[in-house]
Amino acid sequence: MEAKQESSTVWSTASNNDTGNTPQVHFEAGAVAQIVYSGDQSDRTQQQVVYAADGSSYTSVESAEHTLVYIHPADGTQSQLAVTNAALPTLTEASSSPLGATDSTVDSEDEEEDNDSEDSEMDDWEPRALQPFTPQNLWCEDCNNANPAACIKHGPLHPILNRPVMSKARASLPLVLYIDRFLGGVFTKRRIPKRTQFGPLEGPLVRQSELLDTHIHLKLYMLDPEKEGERAQDLWFDLSDEERCNWMMFVRPAQNHLEQNLVAYQYGSDIFYTSIKNIQPKQELKVWYAASYAEFVNQKVHDVTEEERKVLREQEKNWPCYECNRRFMSSEQLQQHLNMHDDKLNLIQRPKSRGRGRGRKRFGGARRPGRRTKFLCPQTPVESADKTQELLASVDKLQFEERTDGALNGLKVVEMAAESMETETEDALDPPPIHTESLQDEEDSVTPPPVTEIPESAKDDLSHTSPIDPHLTPQDMRRARRIRNAALKHLFIRKSFRPFKCPQCGKAFRDKEKLEQHMRFHGRDGCRHVCHQCGKGFLSSTSLEDHLVLHSDQRNYSCLFCAESYDRLELLKVHVGIHMVNGCFLCPSCKKSFTDFIQVKKHVRSFHSEKVFQCSECDKAFCRPDKLRLHMLRHSDRKDFLCSTCGKQFKRKDKLREHMQRMHNPEREAKKADRIHRTKALKQKEPTTDFESFMFKCRLCMMGFRRRGMLVNHLSKRHPEMRLEEVPELTLPIIKPNRDYYCQYCDKVYKSASKRKAHILKNHPGAELPPSIRKLRPAGPGEPDPMLSTHTQLTGTIATAPVCCPHCAKQYSSKTKMVQHIRKKHPEYQYNSSSNIQAPLAATVISSTPAVITTDGTTAEAVVTTDLLTQAMTELSQTLTTDYRTAQGDFQRIQYIPVSQAGGGLSQPQHIQLQVVQVAPASSPHSQHSTVDVSQLHDPHSYSQHSIQVQHIQVAEPTAAVQANAQVSGQPLSPSSQQAAQELSTAQLTPVTLAQQTLQTSSNQTQGATQHAYLPSNWNYRSYPSEIQMMALPHTQYVIAEASTPVTAAVNSSQVKTTHYVISDGQTELDGKQVSVPSTATQGHPDPLEQPAGGQQATTQYIITTTTNGAGASEVHITKP
């Protein structure tokens, strides 16, 4: 035990000289056991040790005093192993046996091979001498040593940086505020009302001499704990350290009273900020001292100038009246002012009468005829009554134009000392307490005072504003306001207070007469229609029939969980309590749990009820009529709900509400404001000079593009005359990723994010939705991959043919996207767009292993470096073009009608039987079936040979006399043909509609027959369908093979020729060329003078010439013009 306790010390203090005392024993599978001896056992010989495969213990031959320390490969921690005394074989025998013999499982052959390779690496490794500890050296656990830099053998480490942590000041910022990154200061996200308190302030306390002028200076009033009642040393808040202060350090001081919206003051032992006005969103917080606190810190409050007072008054009045252009501070004041406009309108419109005024009054003395007076006002002196009328007439003007002065924040207010003064007028205006019981006996004897007619002068005064009576004192104004508030309170109590309640049905009334009138409905007196079951009386038969439904067998309220039904909803709510399981209701259909009966009732009605309400416009059905009405709005064009912020219109009110919550919420507006102040870092785009490195290229402008849409936009703007089918990159399929979307709450898997979202909303209500892939931001250094939170997995790619818009140059990967584009960009064609949708372009894939024919006629293996995009996209498009391939050995028959000579008629039609041949570039032996070879990116694009595969055709030709008259202009003529060429239209020619094919004369053909490949002078290869357009060949070269009419050779000619042309991209027309070979020409070495050179570019075409002698032997030559 002592040896084991000292093992860690011996291990850590081992030096270079102690390596002999710590032998390492190598076992199979790369396991290493190291024996650490104690101090007095260092001279012992090596012990025979077997390291167990499970890593829990080891076995020694004898009870030696040593400790075996196991180093965990995962984290490098050390642990001691228990000792088991047992006699074991020698090391050689132990090492020859597999270590994993204790396990029940047997390793496979592949795992044994991997273990052998690991053993070989461990055998080659030799530990270095342990270097002394130096903090400048980097430790390598694999080498068990330190290095001055990265380990040379094992390479550099893979660092994972710490996640950045915000400072205390920024982390403590409330959610309703944000700090501007560029301007500085604290701004609001939403409206903050007046009298909102922030704080307390946190920060270190220092002396005044250590303060900085960049922040507001705040002093803390403190008492000395040792000396009672005496102040301690003055200490100030240091607001310069973000790690020790909270967010209030970022609030900047106000320069004047106009921009100040916070006051700083000390309450207790803390400093707080309080808002002195309503702070609007996106407004900065500016603080200054309160009046008393400013005197404490030897500062002055900001004086309010007359201009600032006007601005403040206009800012506070945010409720304008559209009748008289006045503004008010609150909606209540505006509503009271609008009532005054209503009174004026009623007084002006109604005619005069000698009786009492019938105009609408809010709080007048006029009463409805036959209505008794409830509350009486005691008699007041005449002077007080006149003054009261004056107050009531001018109270509206006072309430909205009152100006307050005072000592608070420098504002001048009227002295409030007069508030405590009690005058006789105040006593007269304050009525004594009145008891309702004492007034009921006097109600009959009291008559209301007469109301005189309002003179015309008074009506004229009501139509316009007039200044306040200067004789009214502030006390009179306050008393008038109290009278009006008391009247409003009385009106509210009168409307809401219902003390008289019916004992039978529980209905409440404000008056006793109403209750007595209601009680007659419960008895037989005064009611002709009486219920024979409960005795309740009704005034009409309709009301009785509605009541009898409650006593019928058809119960209206049935239980969802059993067969019980009730005539009242209250009884049903009491009953459903017995169906609760652990405080929750379980849906009888899907076993979902709900805490409220209303929720489970809505769930059953929405998802498990029968859909009987069918839509007349479509096939959808609903279980409720209100849902059907909402759905019918989809088929209408009316949009009655308008967003007042952005002007967008909606058909449904709930959609408008969702729009307001999603697009115009305060947090989003605050983010927009923050985004406006941000300046995007301008990245200087350096145009690349490697044109071939781009996937999508415009060869007319020699410009490359990274994306397909950029090339389409470029062609539509710069080259509108060019068709998209003429660009080979735009005919290639579109590669889209294919993903699986997993539900993180169950085992469901979906192919689209929208279906997964609908599943979560329906089956997991209230659960959090996974983030959208489109809104993910790249992870920073040390942060986890954001794709892990989306619960998606990439399962492969899908190659789809592009779908072109019939009205513009746009291309889309699916028909649905294209239809959406038409509805948005071409609404005039959305109803007939289905018939004009272009079918996806078909891409032909060629796969073959042909021979390569060189210029000397021999067949050799060619190493062709193909274009990276062409080869990769060709392999990807193989899955799409199976239907367009023609099986090997299939024959197609075409009919060719030649044109006779001048004055001659049409010759007999000739049928040419052509065998389809698949031609592809020869595969490189170094590619190893690899689609992308990095070495091809910088190879020069110079090609001198390509693959040509030759097959046979059979020609059924008529008599020689008819053939002699057949002549076609624009095609290569035979050496014996000396007649003038005649133009042949493309409508009369029937070209072979298969690309990348060459023809060769059959070896058993009639001697003297001549084979031609014709290309008319007006032939344009871009106008043909996509099947015969440019195919994938090296250097974007394309073979155009055509069948020709056999022409009888001359008598002295023993050789015939067949010519094929290879044209490159960008060459719109290819004129026919006459290739003549003298009869004495040597086979295999054609004269260069035979090649046509008239007006042809050197890099636009290749000419393939096949020479056949009289014996049937043929030879092929590839030359450049």
From Swiss-Prot:
It comes from the Eukaryota. CDD domains: PR-SET_PRDM10 (cd19194). Coiled coil: none annotated. One of its GO terms (cellular component) is nucleus. The keyword Repeat applies. Residues 192-295 are annotated as: N-terminal PR domain. Residues 1-24, 92-125, 350-387, 419-473, 1077-1097 are annotated as: Disordered. The keyword tRNA-binding does not apply. It holds the Pfam family zf-C2H2. One of its GO terms (molecular function) is DNA-binding transcription factor activity. Residues 173-290 form the SET domain. One of its GO terms (biological process) is positive regulation of transcription by RNA polymerase II. Residues 106-124 have a biased composition (Acidic residues). Its main location: nucleus. Residues 351-374 have a biased composition (Basic residues). It is found in: Nucleus. A zinc finger (C2H2-type) spans 319-341, 500-522, 529-551, 557-579, 585-608, 613-635, 641-664, 696-719, 741-764, 803-826. Residues 871-1101 are annotated as: C-terminal glutamine-rich region. Keywords: Activator, DNA-binding, Metal-binding, Nucleus, Repeat, Transcription, Transcription regulation, Zinc, Zinc-finger. Transcriptional activator, essential for early embryonic development and survival of embryonic stem cells (ESCs). Supports cell growth and survival during early development by transcriptionally activating the expression of the translation initiation factor EIF3B, to sustain global translation. Activates the transcription of FLNC. Belongs to the class V-like SAM-binding methyltransferase superfamily. This is PR domain zinc finger protein 10. It comes from Danio rerio.
